[in-house]
Every structure is written in C-alpha cells, then in structure tokens.
Regions:
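Internal, conserved structured core segments that host functional sites
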Residues: 76-90, 111-126
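Core catalytic region of metal-dependent phosphoesterases/phosphodiesterases
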Residues: 14-98
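Active-site neighborhood of phospho(di)ester-bond hydrolases with catalytic His/Asp-centered motifs
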Residues: 6-7, 32-36, 74-78, 122-123, ...
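Beta-strand-turn-beta hairpins that frame and shape the catalytic cleft
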Residues: 1-4, 115-122, 201-203
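Active-site environment of divalent metal-dependent phosphoester hydrolases
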Residues: 10-14, 39-43, 79-85, 128-130, ...
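Active-site-proximal loop/helix segment associated with metal-binding centers of metalloenzymes
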Residues: 96-100, 104, 112, 117-180
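A general structural motif
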Residues: 1, 27-30, 69-71, 118, ...
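Conserved beta-sheet core of the metallophosphoesterase superfamily
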Residues: 170-232
Length: 234
C-alpha cells in the first residue's frame, strides 16, 4: 500500500491539495499523512478570510478522500497546538472569535501527535533523545491530555529560540535529531524545519518543502521545491 506524506501546509491547502489529487491518481495512494501546521502564515495573522477558506477546504477535502476509501491521518504541529489549548501565540490569528472557530475546525480534523509507519516514526518535528513517544500520541487528541500537550507546546530548544535542552516532537529542530538522536527510534519522518528538497538517504527524513519567506520586496518566496514523499509498503 502506498502512503503519501505531506509537510507543513500553513494555509496553503488550496494551492497544494489540487497537486496532491493528481499524485493520488497517478500513484494509487491509499493513505495520506499530514505532518501538521495547517494554520498561520507570516503576514496573514489578520486575514480572516484566508483562514476560513483554507481550513474549510482542507476539511472538505479530507471528508471526500475518506468517503472514497483513502485513510487520512492528521498530525499536530506546533502552530496547531496553541489553538487546541485555547492559548493565542504571537503567530496565531489575532481575532479572538476567529481563533476559537479555528480551534473547532482543527478538532474536526481529528488530530494526533504521531504515527508509526513500519520502521518510521512520523511526527511534526521529531523525537530527540529527550522525548519518547507515549501511547496517547498515536491516538486522537482529547482534552484528557491537555496538560501533556501543554508541555509539548512550550518545550522549545535554543535552535528555535527557547531555553529547554531540546525541543518537543512539536518543536524540535531537525539539527537536534542529528545531534541528540533518539536511539530507540532512529528512523523518522518529520516536517517543521524547512528543507530545500527531500533527502531519503538518511535515517531522519525532513519533508517541509512548502515553507515561505518574505523577501526584501515584501513578496513571498518558497524555501523548498515542493517535494512530496511517497512511501510504498509493498
């Protein structure tokens, strides 16, 4: 069975998912794993229309795929976690009413922290040696684990501007997975850290190839080449 893994979307579902549709057809994809960060984009924290359109598009797309026999797994990204916790971050949408509407939309996506794909542990940012996956990470997130999600949301390493030794599986920098590898889970697939392309030659594979930055002319530019990862279980 073939699985398609998709990195951070950041309000680009309407741009990326039509491309994904073609890949589903071409490669006979039966499972899709989104690695989180569906929300928030530099310079768009007041763009209510973009949040509404993109998230409703994503939700409708997921329902359509599931109705057509495709399994769709949605993982939690660091940006998503603050909505689930009901705590606005500086990069969250600023309108409070819309913030909580986004929270409900994210809950409708049925999010979880991690997914085990054969030998590969899949998560938003990756598990370094400081964090091991817990049973609840592989199940639908519920309020029962709010305190634990809060810890993940606020454990940020120095490479991401925090004070912890290393980041949680929502916040770990890709370099942390190289410098502080989790020996129990050497093979991982992660997003979060922008990559120019996908390199499958190493144990830890980064697939965040859709990230943008704003250039000196105040225009959006892609950091990566838009690669997607197809995993074939044979």
């Amino acid at each position: 069975m073939k699985t398609l893994l998709i990195g951070d979307l950041h309000l680009k579902s309407q741009l990326i998912l039509p491309i994904v549709d073609k890949i589903i057809q071409t490669h006979n994809i039966k499972r899709i794993i989104f690695l989180g960060d569906y929300v928030d984009l530099h310079g768009q924290t007041n763009n209510i229309q973009l949040y509404a359109k993109d998230l409703t598009f994503l939700y409708s797309w997921k329902i359509d795929k599931e109705q057509n026999g495709i399994d769709v797994i949605n993982l939690i990204g660091n940006h998503d976690a603050y909505y689930l916790l009901g705590e606005q971050a500086p990069f969250s949408i600023q309108n409070l009413e819309v913030f909580f509407a986004v929270k409900e939309l994210l809950q409708d996506l049925k999010l979880q922290v991690a997914y085990q794909l054969d030998d590969y542990l899949v998560s938003h940012a990756g598990f370094n040696l400081i964090f091991d996956p817990k049973e609840w990470h592989f199940n639908l997130y519920t309020k029962e684990h709010e305190e634990e999600l809060d810890i993940l949301a606020y454990t940020i390493g120095p490479m991401r501007g925090g004070k912890a030794l290393g980041g949680s599986p929502l916040w770990a920098h890709f370099r942390e997975l190289e410098l502080l590898p989790n020996q129990e889970f050497p093979k991982q697939i992660v997003g979060h850290t922008p990559k120019e392309s996908i390199d499958i030659s190493k144990n830890v594979i980064g697939i965040d190839t859709f990230s943008l930055y704003i250039d000196k002319d105040n225009k959006y530019q892609f950091i990566g080449n838009g690669d997607l990862l197809v995993y074939d279980q044979g």
